[in-house]
Amino acid sequence: MPGKKARKNAQPSPARAPAELEVECATQLRRFGDKLNFRQKLLNLISKLFCSGT
């Protein structure tokens, strides 16, 4: 974007070990999956409450 400028004093992040990156990635994927699972369970509960016409 033309309006944004990069910070001049930005320091590059230190190199991480591959195992540490794998753990962080797995943790983030787990959180993402947990959020999706919770949303699906909530939607199922709502649909059971409001669509119980059978």
From Swiss-Prot:
Residues 41-50 are annotated as: Required for mitochondrial location. Changing L29A: Reduced interaction with BAX. Keywords: Apoptosis, Mitochondrion. Induction: Up-regulated by p53/TP53, phorbol esters, double-stranded RNA, IFNB1/IFN-beta and viruses. Changing F32I: Alters specificity of protein interaction and enhances pro-apoptotic activity. It comes from the Eukaryota. Belongs to the PMAIP1 family. This is Phorbol-12-myristate-13-acetate-induced protein 1. It comes from Homo sapiens (Human). The lineage of its organism: Eukaryota, Metazoa, Chordata, Craniata, Vertebrata. The gene is PMAIP1.
